[in-house]
């Protein structure tokens, strides 16, 4: 059965959340938004392309930073309203220069920083 990006369930702004996960380690790297065209571009090129809500433009991950995400596999959740992108990540995934955007834990009511920026 051929996949059609239009078959996904997008929000009222035409967006769907996409969770990037390191394909080798399983580590969750980040969450960003995609629209149908970003999904199609990602599948066509193998370079993960998101939709930037602040810039209202396509955002090819790593285009300016060099921290490229190459798609290994795209998965659709059971409700078709969220994507899991298994990727090969070059360098840090987070704009703070950390491996993952999820570097802060809440432990005993306090925020704990789990990792420093990569050098």
From Swiss-Prot:
Binding site for Zn(2+): 78, 94, 101
EC number per UniProt: 3.5.4.19
Domain of life: Bacteria
An example Gene Ontology molecular-function term: phosphoribosyl-AMP cyclohydrolase activity
SUPFAM superfamilies reported in the protein's UniProt record: HisI-like
GO cellular component: cytoplasm
Entry's localization field: Cytoplasm
Catalytic activity field: 1-(5-phospho-beta-D-ribosyl)-5'-AMP + H2O = 1-(5-phospho-beta-D-ribosyl)-5-[(5-phospho-beta-D-ribosylamino)methylideneamino]imidazole-4-carboxamide
InterPro entries, per the entry: PRA-CH, PRib_AMP_CycHydrolase_dom, PRib_AMP_CycHydrolase_sf
Record note on cofactor: Binds 1 Mg(2+) ion per subunit. Binds 1 zinc ion per subunit.
Alphabetically ordered keywords of this record: Amino-acid biosynthesis, Cytoplasm, Histidine biosynthesis, Hydrolase, Magnesium, Metal-binding, Zinc
Signal peptide: none
Disulphide bridges: none
UniProt-listed Gene3D superfamilies: Phosphoribosyl-AMP cyclohydrolase (3.10.20.810)
Cofactors (names): Mg(2+); Zn(2+)
BP GO terms, sorted: L-histidine biosynthetic process
Task of the protein: Catalyzes the hydrolysis of the adenine ring of phosphoribosyl-AMP.
Protein family: Belongs to the PRA-CH family.
HAMAP family to which the protein is assigned, alphabetical: HisI
Subunit structure: Homodimer.
Name of the protein described by the UniProt record: Phosphoribosyl-AMP cyclohydrolase
Gene giving rise to this polypeptide: hisI
